[in-house]
Amino acid sequence: MDQAEFEKIIEHTRKSRKYRELILPEETLQDMLTAEAALGGSKAEVIQRFRKKLHNVIAPYLENIDYAQETERMKACFQVNPTPDQVKAWALSVMQKHASTRERLPNIEAFCQCLHGHISTPDRILDLACALDPLLLPWLDFPNETEFLAYDIHQPRVDFLNAFFARAYPSAHAIQQDILVNPPAQPADCAFFFKEAHRFEKRSPGCNRSFFQALP
């Protein structure tokens, strides 16, 4: 397939009913389609493999969270100058809607205490493939000057997190970036990579070692 065909497939995928609300990075689709095309076969076979791999990798993002609605709920919460406990209650209500994040909620206090005990107060943290992990910040209680950079490929989620950061964590930023294709260039004292290595392996077997080595 030539580049024009690649672009047509990518554009069709981004606009499909299944994926359009995610606003996936073009670099993600280009990387996955290129990898499948390199394996050979007919155009139909390449597209079939691409769609299957894309579903396996992206399926966890196909959640039932209305991030525009959650942003409005968050704004309402912060309009009344909430207490720390009220912020935590709001964060829990959102994390409960995300399958992967929900699994750690019964142990959230112990998890955050253990995590904080290991990393103390780093100057900069990278949260790689963050999902809703940044909503743990009210429990981690880092200093205001701690820089927290959260990376995800789901644009509506990134926008939601940035709205949250703007109201509560001015040194935090969410970035839409495919970290496997384009690893973060910023050096950091600590990086979170929660429950994502297996999905990287599904996408590109054996990639985790080179990914970790690419981090500054």
Write out the residue ranges for each language-model feature.
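Conserved SAM-binding loop
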Residues: 161-162
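Conserved SAM-binding strand-loop segment of SAM-dependent methyltransferases
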Residues: 169-180
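Conserved SAM-binding loop of SAM-dependent methyltransferases across substrates and taxa
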Residues: 132-144
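A short SAM/SAH-binding and catalytic strip from SAM-dependent methyltransferases
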Residues: 137, 188-204
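Conserved class I S-adenosyl-L-methionine
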Residues: 121-133
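Conserved SAM/SAH-binding beta-strand->alpha-helix loop
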Residues: 154-156
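Conserved Class I S-adenosyl-L-methionine-dependent methyltransferase catalytic core
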Residues: 37-118
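Conserved SAM-binding motif I beta-strand of class I
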Residues: 147-152
